[in-house]
Amino acid sequence: MQPMPLLLRQSLRSSANFARTSLPIRPQFLPAAGPNLQPAREIQRSFSVCVRCQFRSQSPLYSSPEKDTSKDDAATQQSKDGSSTLTPGDESAKVEPDAETQRPSPAAGEQDTLQGFYQDAKNEPKRESAEKKGLPSYLEERRSQLSKQFTEMMDNLQSNIFVAGQRLNDLTGYSAIEALKKDIQLQEERLREARQRVREAKNAYAAAINRRSASQREVNELLQRKHAWSAADLERFTHLYRNDHTNEVAEMETQEALSAAERESEEAAAQLSKSILSRYHEEQVWSDKIRRMSTWGTWGLMGVNVLLFLVFQIAVEPWRRKRLVKGFEEKVIEAIEKEKAINHIEILKPQPALTSTSPSSKEEAAEPTPTSTAAGDTPTTDESTPAATDETITSEPVVWDSDPIPTFVTNITAEIATETTEDSAPKSATINGVEPRKSQLSRILPPLPPPTSLDSWRHTLNELFSDRSMVITQRDLTTVALQSAAAGAAIMGLVIALIRPR
């Protein structure tokens, strides 16, 4: 029979091993009630009788991780050394914290479960919205929302347009005329009611007259046969005589009512006509003011057109002319360069053919070599200069289609080639040929005077009234015609405004 401490130790070890082997990968959420409530309470137990075991279980609270490992090693060594001196109660207290430290705390598992639940709860509306987007009810609801928004926008647009019109009427002074219109409508309604009362009063007055006349006729008939009255005739006569005064009073009242209704109708008609005349006068004043404003606006537009015309003629037109001249110069220089390159190629092209024929042709081909070297910007003799000049001048000119520049360009090219061969300029100046071309262009095109001098104005006037031919587009012609018409209208309007008597 084993002693009690050994049995207790074995039972505790077996329970600790069972707890290690049956540990799940992810702790499940424990129910609040049931037969597993007692083990949960045992797992949540975090105290022990042994002070050393308590310190071991709570060592992360008192030290850093590096020191904790050293302390754990020292504690395990001390536990191995002093295992024989421990009491059974100490051993049981030691085994229980080991099992508790190896088992994960249920709070962490519950926290993970709650986090997963919260994530699912957050993602569930997104999934539901994604599923509902394809449903007909969702599309119908979306369409109804869009239609409501469109209706609201249109209502706001109408109100905004009305408010804008009201503000415009306030600025132009038409709001008073609108008030007069409303007053006229009220007066028309009042006149209509007054005329209706006049008709009713006339009918009542006519009825009272008829009633009194009928009573008087009956009285006269009774008086004519007075000698044959019966008791009923006497009572009838008495009744008619008594009602005659009442009929007379009713006739007078209806007559007065008719007169009052007629006076009221006349007053309403007079007030209506007065309001109509006032509205007509105010509308005339408003139309005159608008016409005056439109006249001043027209004059302002005419002035702006005249100012733009003057600015265009004084500032823009010279700048455009200068730009056109500059572009023309660049095009002429480019054409000269192309012509020179073509002439140079034509001069150098026959050399291979001549060298491949015979030795005599080689000797003859040696003669234009100085010319080519002269074209290549090397000094030449006086004998080679005429040949190069003749070849350059007599070379085929470039064919231009419907352009007046070809002869002009070929002449300038011939002069430039002559000057370059005679002067034998340096290599860089001969290749570029800028100075000779500029001199030729300055010789052909007269220099323009400064834009601020009197000669510039004289030159501009001469250009405006010169006989030189120009190519103009339909748009420019239409623009000039419209500007001229606007300027003429402005001048004539100014003259009429000055001459018109006040």
Swiss-Prot record:
Gene Ontology CC annotations of this record: mitochondrial inner membrane
Topological region Mitochondrial matrix: 500-502
Region: Disordered, residue numbers: 60-112, 121-140, 350-400, 419-447
Ranges that cross the membrane: 296-316, 479-499
Major location (coarse): mitochondrion
One family name in Pfam for this protein: She9_MDM33
Membrane topology category: Multi-pass membrane protein
Cytoplasm listed as a keyword: no
Biological-process GO terms, alphabetical: inner mitochondrial membrane organization
Subcellular location: Mitochondrion inner membrane
Residues forming coiled coils: 139-276
Parts of the chain on the Mitochondrial intermembrane side: 317-478
Keyword Manganese found: no
Biased amino acid composition, Basic and acidic residues: 65-74, 91-101
Family membership noted in the UniProt record: Belongs to the SHE9 family.
Function statement: Required for the maintenance of the structure of the mitochondrial inner membrane. Involved in mitochondrial morphology. Causes growth arrest when highly overexpressed.
Subunit-structure text: Homooligomer.
UniProt protein name: Sensitive to high expression protein 9 homolog, mitochondrial
